[in-house]
């Protein structure tokens, strides 16, 4: 099992919660408790080496709010759902996004992930309706079609990196969903390859001394990024041009780009997006829409390989929902061979795959693809009795909150059955937030849920995975929570 930090107690947590904007004051600030060292940058080095372990230890030791410094930078870690809700929903205008996402401007321009203020709010009003569940259901067949092609390519008994496979399939799916049936196969492949290059580039920039990379243009990684960006720009702008020409000829499309091209902000009386705005939003959807889901699926398959009883119940549900019967396993009910003939899952099956949904939800609790959210205060801000000064960095970690025993008993145990309707109803809103929340929450959340459930059902319908015991599993928390060394799995075909 992958090693991870955990709370051993939550006795240090306070239940009080009060946040608000605060005025600047000349009085000496009272800081919350937190780790301090006489050695400069000691904590920063610990955070760079193992950020999740560091944040977990701080949360366990100091409770709902902790203060520490990275060099001269004041940092606050919030571990209370109410505090997080106040920042992400009620007082979001008091904060801007932290450096990690600003780095992405190199590719994304002023897309939803990187933009701020009124421009961000306007773009969100334009884009969010295009990603509503009722509109994205039409992409379900694309998801299962790519999954089937991948399953047919696999061979029984081989060992492969399932993380790489998930990156490739989610890249292909998002390319097809956004750019549609008119995209050529070589263009789709080009999008996937270029996205991988860009994702790796941004992850490198966020590593220690990553800012130095940009200052040496001749480095291969910089040249590779520029080539990938140029390729993506060429494909996206050409597709925008083609879609506009089709529109002028009254030829409609069913892809997301066509929907975005039609969208406008009726509330503000602002017309359609320009080519440049469309380009930025398409790039944002590309980058945000493949790696997070790929990581979530990778961790899901890993957890299933470690819990054969859960995997067996998953396969039984698949057979019941998609085959009108129960799995008749010749291997003693362990999810092995089955005589049940099953059909391909559809969007209409998603609500019926209840245990599949619980598995995906629990996987994202244990290994949230977006493992922390950072904000920078642009004004002084009050949390409980403490004033957070303008310029401070605020961290709100999904990983930390999702492993808090106050909200999840035995948080280090993979237990999909914890997700009862009653549990989901009574959990504080930001005790579980794999997709963020508020005005800056992930607009693609419905797409991700549908994609995750359909891919799990389609793949596990045909294959069982066994984790390579010789393969080391370790967390790699960069922009998203990746497996550091990939995820080696041996494939077993169901017959």
What are the residue ranges of the model-derived segments?
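N-terminal membrane-proximal hinge/A-helix region immediately C-terminal to the signal-anchor transmembrane segment
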Residues: 2-122, 137-150, 228-231, 374, ...
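Conserved cytochrome P450 K-helix/beta-meander segment immediately N-terminal to the heme-binding cysteine loop
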Residues: 396-423
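C-terminal helix/juxtamembrane-tail motif
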Residues: 482-495
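Conserved cytochrome P450 K-helix E-x-x-R motif and the immediately C-terminal K′/meander segment
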Residues: 41-63, 234, 238, 342-384, ...
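Cytochrome P450 heme-thiolate "Cys pocket" and heme-binding signature region
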Residues: 283, 288, 347, 421-452, ...
């Amino acid at each position: 099992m992958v090693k991870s930090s955990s709370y051993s107690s939550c006795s240090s947590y306070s239940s009080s919660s009060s946040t608000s904007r605060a005025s600047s004051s000349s009085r000496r600030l009272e800081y919350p408790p937190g780790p301090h060292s006489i050695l400069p940058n000691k904590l920063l080095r610990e955070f760079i080496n193992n950020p999740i372990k560091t944040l977990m230890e701080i949360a366990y030791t100091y409770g709902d709010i902790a203060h520490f410094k990275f060099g001269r930078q004041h940092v606050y870690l919030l571990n209370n759902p109410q505090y997080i809700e106040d920042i992400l929903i009620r007082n979001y205008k008091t904060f801007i996004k932290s450096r990690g996402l600003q780095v992405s401007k190199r590719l994304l321009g002023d897309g939803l992930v990187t933009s701020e203020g009124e421009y961000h709010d306007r773009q969100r009003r334009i884009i969010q309706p295009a990603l509503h569940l009722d509109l994205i259901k039409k992409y379900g067949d694309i998801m299962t079609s790519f999954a089937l092609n991948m399953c047919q390519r696999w061979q029984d008994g081989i060992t492969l990196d399932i993380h790489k496979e998930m990156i490739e399939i989610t890249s292909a799916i998002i390319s097809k969903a956004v750019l549609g049936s008119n995209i050529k196969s070589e263009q789709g492949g080009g999008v996937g390859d270029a996205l991988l290059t860009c994702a790796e580039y941004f992850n490198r920039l966020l590593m220690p001394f990553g800012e130095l990379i940009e200052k040496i243009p001749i480095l291969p990684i910089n040249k590779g990024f520029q080539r990938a960006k140029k390729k993506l720009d060429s494909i996206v702008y050409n597709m925008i041009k083609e879609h506009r020409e089709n529109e002028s000829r009254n030829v409609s499309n069913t892809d997301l780009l066509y929907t975005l091209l039609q969208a406008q902000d009726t509330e503000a009386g602002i017309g359609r997006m320009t080519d440049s705005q469309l380009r930025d939003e398409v790039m944002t959807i590309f980058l945000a829409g493949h790696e997070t889901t790929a990581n979530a699926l990778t961790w899901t398959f890993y957890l299933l390989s470690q819990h054969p009883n859960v995997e067996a119940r998953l396969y039984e549900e698949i057979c019941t929902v998609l085959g009108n019967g129960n799995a008749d396993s010749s291997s003693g009910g362990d999810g092995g061979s089955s005589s049940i003939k099953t059909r391909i899952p559809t969007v209409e099956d998603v609500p019926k795959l209840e245990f599949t949904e619980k598995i995906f939800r629990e996987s994202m609790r244990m290994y949230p693809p977006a493992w922390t959210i950072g904000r920078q205060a642009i004004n002084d801000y009050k949390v409980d009795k403490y004033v957070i000064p303008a310029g401070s960095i605020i961290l709100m970690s999904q990983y930390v909150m999702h492993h808090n025993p106050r909200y999840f008993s035995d948080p280090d145990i993979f237990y999909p059955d914890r997700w009862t309707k009653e549990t989901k109803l009574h959990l504080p809103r930001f005790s579980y937030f794999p997709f963020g929340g508020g005005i800056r929450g992930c607009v693609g959340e419905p797409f991700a849920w549908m994609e995750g459930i359909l891919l799990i059902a389609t793949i596990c319908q045909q294959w069982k995975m066994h984790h390579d015991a010789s393969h080391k599993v370790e967390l790699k928390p960069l922009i998203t929570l990746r497996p550091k060394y990939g995820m080696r799995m041996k494939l077993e075909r169901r017959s």
